[in-house]
Amino acid sequence: MPIIYSLVARGSSVLAEFTSTNGNFVTITRRILDLIPPNDTKMSYVYEKYIFHYLVSDTLTYLCMADEEFGRRIPFTFLDDVKNRFKSMYGDKGKTAIAYGMNSDFSRTLENLMDHYSNTTRVDTMSRTMAEIDEVKNILVSDIAPQLLKRGEKIEMLVERTDTLNQQSFKFKKQSKQLKCAMWWKNVKLMLVLGAIVLIIIFIIVMSYCDGFRSGSKCRSSPSSNSTPTPTPTETPTPTPTPTSTPTPSQLLETLLNQF
C-alpha cells in the first residue's frame, strides 16, 4: 500500500490514526509531530525511502506516510479529503478532544480513504507529473533523517503482507526444487530401464548363436553349404583268438604210459 500510515493530531496528541502494517514508524511519527509548527502550512519530510506529508489547518495536523516513489500530489489530495471529512464529522470538537477520542470511528474513515487513494494510480505519467508540479510547487520538502538519526532511529517496516509473500516465494522455490529433483530421478530411472532392455536384447541375440554357458559360452559356427562332409572311418573287426586248453598233470601221465 503506497500510503502506509495516516493520523489526525492536535499538537502531539493523536486523535485518530490507522495503519495496516506493523513497524516502528509510529514512534518516528511522534518525533515528527514535535517538529511541526502550529501555523497553517503544508510540508513533506523525506526519511530514507519514505516521505511524511502533513498539512496543518486550524491547529489540527493531518499527516500520512507514503512510499517515496508515490509522489506528493496524491498524498496531499488524500490529506485534504481527510481534513474535510474530519471537519464535517466533528466540527470544532477536535480542538478540545482527548487523545484518541475520535479513533474508534474515524480510523475506519482513514482506512477507506487510504485504500482509495493508494489505488488511484491509473493516470497518465506525463499529466500526473505536470499536475504535481502545479499543485505542490509551493510545498516545502525537508530531509528529516539527520534529526532523527541523532537518536538512532531507523524505520523498520514489518509488513505482514510482505512476510506472507516471502513465505509463499520460499514455498514456491522449495516445491520447484523438489519437482526438479523428482524429474531428474525419473529421467535416470527411464535411462536405466532402456539400458536394461538393450542389454537383454543383445544377450538374446548372442545366445541364439552360442552354446550358452555349458562349454564356456563357446559359439558354434554356422554350417557352410559348400563344405564336403568328412567320411567317418570304419573300424575293421579283429578276430578273437580261440583259447587253447592247458593239459592237466594226469593227462600228461596217461599220454606217456600209452607211448610205452
From Swiss-Prot:
SUPFAM superfamilies, per database record: SNARE fusion complex, SNARE-like
Family listed: Belongs to the synaptobrevin family.
Localization of this protein: Cytoplasmic vesicle, Secretory vesicle membrane; Golgi apparatus, trans-Golgi network membrane; Late endosome membrane; Lysosome membrane
InterPro entries named in the record: Longin-like_dom_sf (IPR011012), Longin_dom (IPR010908), Synaptobrevin-like (IPR001388), Synaptobrevin-like_transport (IPR051097), V_SNARE_CC (IPR042855)
GO cellular component: a single term: endoplasmic reticulum membrane
UniProt keyword annotations, A-Z: Coiled coil, Cytoplasmic vesicle, Endoplasmic reticulum, Endosome, Golgi apparatus, Lysosome, Membrane, Protein transport, Signal-anchor, Transmembrane, Transmembrane helix, Transport
Cytoplasmic domain ranges by topology: 1-189
PANTHER family: SNARE PROTEINS (PTHR21136), VESICLE-ASSOCIATED MEMBRANE PROTEIN 9 (PTHR21136:SF168)
All ranges on the Vesicular side of the membrane: 211-260
Span of domain Longin: 7-110
Residue ranges of the TM segments: 190-210
Main location class: membrane
Disulfide pattern: none
Role, per record: Involved in the targeting and/or fusion of transport vesicles to their target membrane during transport of proteins from the early endosome to the lysosome. Required for heterotypic fusion of late endosomes with lysosomes and homotypic lysosomal fusion.
Membrane topology reported for the UniProt record: Single-pass type IV membrane protein
Entries under Pfam families matching the protein: Longin (PF13774), Synaptobrevin (PF00957)
Top-level taxon in the UniProt lineage: Eukaryota
This protein's name: Vesicle-associated membrane protein 7B
Highest classification ranks of the organism: Eukaryota, Amoebozoa, Evosea, Eumycetozoa, Dictyostelia
CDD domains per the UniProt record, alphabetical: Longin (cd14824), R-SNARE (cd15843)
Biased composition (Pro residues): 230-246
